[in-house]
Amino acid sequence: MTLSFTARWRDELPATYTALLPTPLKNARLIWYNDELAQQLAIPASLFDATNGAGVWGGETLLPGMSPVAQVYSGHQFGVWAGQLGDGRGILLGEQLLADGSTLDWHLKGAGLTPYSRMGDGRAVLRSTIRESLASEAMHYLGIPTTRALSIVTSDTPVQRETQETGAMLMRLAQSHMRFGHFEHFYYRREPEKVQQLADFAIRHYWPQWQDVAEKYALWFEEVAARTGRLIAEWQTVGFAHGVMNTDNMSILGLTIDYGPFGFLDDYDPGFIGNHSDHQGRYRFDNQPSVALWNLQRLAQTLTPFIEIDALNRALDRYQDALLTHYGQRMRQKLGFFTEQKDDNVLLNELFSLMAREGSDYTRTFRMLSHTEQQSASSPLRDTFIDRAAFDAWFDRYRARLRTEAVDDALRQQQMQRVNPAIVLRNWLAQRAIDAAEQGDMAELHRLHEVLRQPFTDRDDDYASRPPEWGKRLEVSCSS
C-alpha cells in the first residue's frame, strides 16, 4: 500500500511557515520504531529496513507528496511575552491522508537549523528523544490525548548541551501541531485577518460541522476550552506534571504536546516541580489547572477581533466546568464510586492529606486501593502508612461509603483497575533506558516501551515499584 500525503497547512496558511529540507545527521541509524502504530497506519515494513539507511526517519529522503515546512509561532514563556518562537529544530514533513479522510502530521524533531532556531543548533539529543517517545506512548496507553512517537534515529553527530551528547531525531505524529502560540504570533503582529484564517483552518478541518453556523467561532473556542479542561483533569488524576506549560506548548486540539521536563508523581507532593529551571514553581503540579486557564485567556485575547467578549467569557467558564466535571468523574472512578455523594470530596481530600504527610506513592496507593474488599478491614495499603490509626479511621469511612452502593467487590475492583494504573513512566525508568542507549544497548528502551503498552496490568518487578534512592527527585531541564 502506498502512503498518501497532503499539504493542507502549506497550501492554506502561506504566512505561517518557511519551506525547507531537513539536514541529515552523520551516520544516522534507526534504533526504535513503533511497530504497532506503523501497522495501524499501513506504513510499509520496507521503510524501516536498516539496510536502506535512516531514510525518511533521519531526514535523508522524503516520501512522495511530502512538502516540508518549519512553522512560525510566538508565545508566553513562564508568564512573560517571549515574542517570535517557532519550530527551531522541528520540520513538518507532511500530512498523511488516512482512510477516513482525516490527516496525521509527520513532524521530524531534531531536523536541523530553521529560520526560527534563534541561538539554537536545530538539533535534538538522544536523551530527549527517548524521553519524548516513552512519555507520549505512555500517555496514549493511559488513554490521555497526546502526540505519538513513530521512530527514533541516533547518529555520530555530537551535540553540545550541558555536556556533549548524541544527536538524534524523533518522528512525532499528531492530528495537528496547531498551538495557542500560532494565534498569538499574528495577534501581536497586528494581523487579525491571519488570526481569523487560523481559526477558519481549524474549523474547516477539525470541526467541519460548524463551518456554516453563524456562531462558529464562539462554538469552536468553547470546544477548545472544554478539551483543554478535560486534558488537564486527566493530567491531574494520573499524577502527570508537564513542566513547561508555555502558551506555545498548548495544543488547540487538547493534546499533550512537547514533552520536556515532565514527570509523573512518585511521592504524592501537590507542589511537585518537574523542571529544575522553574525556580518560582509556576508549572508545579497543583498549579497546572490555573496555568491552563491563564493560557486560554491569552488565546481568548487574540480572538477579540471576531468573537464577542461575552462569548469568550462563556467559553472560559466552560473550561472550569469541563475540568471540574471530568476531574470529579475520574476521581470517583479511581475511588470505586459509581454515584456522586456530597461528602466524596471530603473523603478524597482526607486521603490526599494522609498521603502528603506520609510521602505515599501516588500511583501505588491508588492501585493498592483497587484491591479493597468492603467487608474487610485488612489491606496491604495499611502497611505503607506509618500512622496506622489515621489510616484505619479513614479506611473505615471509605469502606462505609462503598457499602452505600449495591456494587459487589469484583465489579468495583474491575472498574478501579481500569483507571488506576500499575505502571507509569517514572523518571528513573526513563533514565535507565537512556543510560543503556547512550552506551549502545537499546534492549531496555524496547523493553520499557513494551511495558508501557500495558499500564493497567499488575507486575511484581521493578517497573511497578517505587524508585530506588538514586532515582528519586531526578533533575530534569528544558535542555533537549
UniProtKB/Swiss-Prot annotation:
Its EC number is 2.7.7.-, 2.7.7.108. Its cofactor is Mg(2+); Mn(2+). InterPro entries: adnlytase_SelO, SelO. Keywords: ATP-binding, Magnesium, Manganese, Metal-binding, Nucleotide-binding, Nucleotidyltransferase, Transferase. The active site is at D248 (proton acceptor). One of its GO terms (molecular function) is AMPylase activity. Coiled coil: none annotated. It comes from the Bacteria. Mg(2+) binds at N249, D258. It catalyses: L-seryl-[protein] + ATP = 3-O-(5'-adenylyl)-L-seryl-[protein] + diphosphate; L-threonyl-[protein] + ATP = 3-O-(5'-adenylyl)-L-threonyl-[protein] + diphosphate; L-tyrosyl-[protein] + ATP = O-(5'-adenylyl)-L-tyrosyl-[protein] + diphosphate; L-histidyl-[protein] + UTP = N(tele)-(5'-uridylyl)-L-histidyl-[protein] + diphosphate. It is an enzyme of class 2 (transferase). ATP binds at G86, G88, R89, K109, D121, G122, R172, R179, D258. Belongs to the SELO family. Nucleotidyltransferase involved in the post-translational modification of proteins. It can catalyze the addition of adenosine monophosphate (AMP) or uridine monophosphate (UMP) to a protein, resulting in modifications known as AMPylation and UMPylation. This is Protein nucleotidyltransferase YdiU. It comes from Salmonella paratyphi A (strain AKU_12601).
